[in-house]
Structures are given as C-alpha cells and as structure tokens.
Regions:
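Membrane-proximal intracellular helices of multi-pass ion channels
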Residues: 1-607
C-alpha cells in the first residue's frame, strides 16, 4: 500500500507542476510580459545589444537550421579543446591530465546533443573548471536548443502563408534567461539545502576504521580479497602471501560544486552525473527530499512542453491529448518495471538465498543494484522517468534490473524518446508520430490528412518518417556494426543474452539521446567512443532537420476549415490511435533485437 501511494504521489506532483510551467513557457515563446520581466528583460535586451541580435528577425527554416548547426558545432569544438587543455588550465586541484582525443570527442558530442553519455567517471577524469565551464554550460545550451526548435515547430503550425519561424538566437536567449536559469536557481538552492555538496575544495582523504586488502583484476582495477589476513603491508590468505596485493588504509572522498550541475542535469534532461554513479551517490542525492526534487524536475519541462504546444497553436485540447498519450505510456511502462522488480527473480528466491517478501523491515523483491535509502518503488519510478525522458541519470544500476525491467527501459529509449522525451525534442518527436497517425487514419477513410488545420502532404510525410525512424536506424545499424567487431566480447562483463543486452542498451541509449548505461560494457576505447559520438550527433540533428523542414513547409500553407469528415485529433480515439502507432513502430523496429537480449534472458530466467 505504501508503495502504491509513492507511485501516485510522484505522478500527481509531476502533473500539478507541469500545467503552470507550460503556460509560463508559452508566454516566454511570444515575448510576453511575465512576473520575471522587470528583472530579466533588461538583461535580455543587453544580450541582444551585445551580440547584435535583431529581436524582430524572422528566420526561414534553412537559416534557423543553419544557426542551430553552427551554434552546436562551435560548442563541440570548444568542449573538445577545454578537455584536451585541462592540465594547463586552473580549477584543477587534483592535477588531472588532459583527456584523450577519442574520449574528448565522445564527451563533447554527448553534451552538445543533450545525451550526456559518460564513458568516464567525473570525479577522476574532469577538473572543476571543465565540469562547470564546459559541461554545465552545455547542459543549459543543449536544453535551450531543444526548446527553441519546439518553438519553431509551434510557429509553423500557427503561421498562415508565412516564411518566418522566429529567431533561433532570440528563442535560445529567452529560454535560458526566463526558464532554465530561474528554475535551476531554485532547484540548486533546494538541493544544496538538502545536503548535495557544493564547494571547490580538493578531494579529501579519510582513515578507514579497518584496513582492506585488494588485488589487481582483469579489468585493470582492484578487487577486495575475501578472507585476507593483514600483517602490516603483507596480505595472506590461508597462510599464503598474496603477490601483488595492497593494503588500503584511506578512503578517497570527492568534492566539488555538485548541486548546481545536478539541478540542470535533471531539469534539462541532460543526465550526466557529477560523480560516476550519478544520483545513486550520497553526495549527489543523499535523501528522500533531494530524490523527489531530482526525479520531479527530470520530467517537469518535457511534460510542460505539451501544454506550451497546446497554447501556442491556440488549441489547448490538442496539448492535453498529446500529454494524455505520453502519460498513458509512462504509467504502463512504470507499472511493468515496478511489478517485475517487486516480484524479483526465481534465482534470488532459490533455496531461500534471499528473502524477496516485502515486510516492514525490507523492500523485498529485486534490491540488487538499488540503494536501501530509496527502495524499489522510488528506484523503479526513476528508471521509468529517466528512460522516458532523454535524461539518463540513475539512482540505481539498470544492469541489475530484471530482464523485463531492462526490456522496458530499452524500449522507451528506442521509441525515440517520445514518452515525454527530452526538453523540446520529446514534443516534436511525438508530433512526428501524430502526423503519421493522421496520415494512416486518412488512408482508412480516403481523405487527405489534416492536422491542426494544415494539410499533411507527401513532403511533410517524408520528413515525418525521418523524424520517426532516425532513432531506430541509428540504433540498429550501429549495434549491428559493433557486434561484428571481433574484440567487442572482451569489453563485456557478461556473455550470452545479457551481454548482447549490454551492447544494445549502450547504442540504444546514445541513439535515443538518453545517456544511461547498463555499465557492464567498457566503452572507453577509441573505436567505441568514436562510433557512439557519431551516433549521438546523427540521432540528435536528423530529427531537428526533419522538424524544421516540416515547420517551414507548414508555415507557408493556409488553414483548412474543419468539415464533418475532419478527423478529430483531440478526443480519446485519437489518443488511443497515437499510443497504438507509437507501440507498433517500436515493436516492428526493435522486437527482433530485443528478442535476442532481454526477452531471451527472461525465458532463460524462468526455464
């Protein structure tokens, strides 16, 4: 019963906060006066004067796209350079060396695309300067870019026989100044007050209560030696000296300005953790209070975008219908994950090895890879939220979820991040499916499809297909190529179906601009870093190209009057059709691959 209340609470908080934020963002899109205008409007005008931006400019789709690509390209180059020169720059109290070329490219591609895939551990790889001047800045700018493209799409539906979609520079500036900075100022203060660390001290060392013996392992790291007898610097097991063993007497305690970066990594659906284990780390997410802030902010802006869309196209029912479709999918997927994690696996219960019954003293179920301070309900909800959005942050280890739990996580990412998805990009991804839905419905009744008063013709359909299939194409092609590389098996912690799931999850995460990982695959080698980086760039910018092409085409068209034969896109039937089409495309595209991974593992589990 307590778990059910938790699930209801998480969903309710999301809906209650998303509605007013959606209205506020609609006002920002049109440059209307808001309660923040007296403070921020002078700053906004100053930015325009400094950068010589014409606030009244109307860009066509090609110029808008060129601005997006040039801006992102500059960010890519700057972030690569910042990492490469890390050892020569200030703000590096640990004296960390420069980052290798392949990891620099992978990380830069990851953060400018809002993916935040991490082939590294933040506390041991990147300096404070790179973290806040490089990664945190891109967290704001990549999120702002996604929202700006969504604004352009809204104007495409709203304009009548016009060329302009607004100005990318104005949309980006307003989004960052009015939405992202104020929102994350509040979140950052709340997180710091809740115990998330925020300082610029170098890492600390603490004496262990008891020394620990470790030895080198096959992965190049160190493993604890069970049953070791420690005599000074000598380690023995069963009276025999263990060669190459070390005695650890100190613990490494990382520090840094985590709270501000955690705030934007959540609300901007970025997801890249300040620490290697992300929001499972007690310095990044220490309590239930910080957890609900981080988890709610994860989907807040993507959910609000639905209501912004409805207000922007002057059809609030349409925004509610899109929200309903996304919300239904989220509830279904969260339920599947939760049920499987609460049930656990036969192997856990075999012979009474683990008590998987829920009691007052324990969560029961599959607690492997989950933090005891969060339990199954909170961990399952977070995993559903983070793979629904293009976020990828974690408060538990997805590699340790049950086969069907991992199946749902992969499926949500594989759908193209349309179950709310990323800030801005989730909305325009779902609009691609909505256009596909009205086209299929039009074929069934023999009418030219219409959506929001605009005729959907072959040009829009071609780009809608690109929008819907860019992610599946990137994921499946890159996964197939990787599986043909002979050395891939050496980078996996597991073989068989779960090993394939680790590969598929990595490429699904990057292709879906998500960034989470099963973490059972060593991705920090040159060819994998480069392949994942290229996949992230393709999967980010191909949908943007398709979205702006659709927006530019629709803006030139006139409005079509509704008639008795016009398909309603705001009722329950359309919501059902939209959900069905999303699941159908996902099933047709990914079931063969998923059958070789999590589905096969599920049948092995119950055999």
């Amino acid at each position: 019963m307590d778990a059910a209340i938790q699930y209801i609470l998480y969903f309710a908080v999301l809906v209650v906060l998303a509605v007013p934020l959606g209205r506020f963002m609609a006002h920002i899109m049109d440059g209307e006066h808001t309660f923040l205008s007296p403070v921020i409007a002078p700053v906004e005008r100053g930015v325009y004067r400094l950068l010589r931006i014409d606030a009244a400019e109307q860009m066509g789709c090609r110029r808008y796209l060129a601005s997006v690509l040039v801006f992102s390209g500059i960010g890519l180059v700057a972030l690569v350079a910042l990492q490469a020169l890390q050892s020569f720059l200030p703000g590096n109290p640990q004296h960390l060396p420069g980052v290798s070329w392949d990891l620099s490219f992978n990380t830069a591609a990851s953060f400018i695309t809002n993916t935040n895939w991490q082939s590294y551990s933040g506390e041991t790889t990147l300096s404070y300067l790179v973290q806040f001047m490089g990664l945190t800045v891109q967290n704001f700018l990549s999120a702002g870019t996604g929202i700006a493209v969504m604004f352009a799409l809204i104007r495409g539906f709203r304009q009548v026989k016009e060329q302009g979609l607004g100005s990318f520079w104005v949309d980006l500036t307003r989004t960052v100044l009015y939405v992202l900075i104020p929102l994350n100022l509040v979140f950052g203060i709340c997180l710091a007050a809740g115990g998330v660390i925020s300082n610029f001290q170098p890492a600390q060392k603490a004496e262990l209560v008891e020394p620990v013996a470790v030895q080198p392992n096959a992965d190049g790291g160190w493993s604890v030696i069970d049953g070791a007898q420690i005599e000074g610097d000598t380690v023995k097991v069963d009276g025999k000296v263990v060669e190459g063993a070390r005695v650890v007497t100190e613990q490494f305690l990382p520090q840094g300005a985590a709270a501000p970066q955690v705030a934007i990594k959540q609300s901007g659906t970025n997801g890249g953790g300040f620490f290697g284990v992300n929001s499972a780390h007690p310095y990044e997410n220490p309590s239930a209070f910080t957890n609900i802030i981080e988890m709610t902010s994860l989907l807040l802006i993507p959910a609000a975008c639905c209501f912004t869309f409805g207000i922007g196209v002057k059809n609030t029912k349409q925004g509610k219908a899109i929200f309903a479709a996304m919300f239904i999918l989220l509830v279904i997927f969260t339920g599947i994950i939760a049920v499987n994690e609460h049930m656990g696996t036969p192997q856990l219960a075999d012979g009474g090895a683990v008590n998987i019954e829920m009691t007052d003293g324990q969560a029961g179920g599959n607690m492997e890879g989950k933090e005891s301070r969060f339990g199954i309900a909170t961990s399952s909800t977070w995993s559903a939220y983070t793979t629904a959005a293009s976020n990828g942050s974690v408060n538990s280890m997805h590699d340790s979820y049950t086969p069907l739990g991992g199946f749902v996580q992969m499926l949500q990412m594989a759908l193209g991040e349309v179950v709310f998805g990323g800030v801005g990009c989730g909305l325009y991804g779902m609009i691609g499916f909505a256009i596909l839905t009205v086209f299929i419905a039009g074929l069934m009744v023999g009418r030219t499809p219409e959506f929001l008063g605009k005729k959907i013709e072959p040009g829009e359909m071609r780009w809608a297909v690109v929008l819907c299939l860019a992610t599946p194409f990137a994921i499946l092609v890159c996964s197939a190529i990787a599986c043909m590389v002979p050395g891939l098996a050496d980078q996996l912690n597991n073989g068989g179906a779960h090993g394939f799931s680790e590969v598929l999850y990595a490429f699904t995460s990057c292709g879906g601009n998500n960034g989470s990982a099963f973490a059972g695959m060593n991705c920090n080698i040159p060819w994998i870093n480069v392949m994942l980086g290229l996949e992230m760039l393709f999967a980010r910018f191909m949908p943007i190209i398709g979205t702006l092409a659709i927006a530019g085409s629709l803006a030139k068209k006139g409005k079509v009057a509704e008639s008795a034969g016009t398909l309603s896109t705001t009722n329950g039937m359309f919501v059902f059709l939209l959900v069905f089409i999303v699941l159908l495309i996902g099933a047709l595209s990914f079931f063969p691959a998923l059958a070789l991974g999590p589905v096969a593992e599920f049948f092995q589990m119950i055999a």
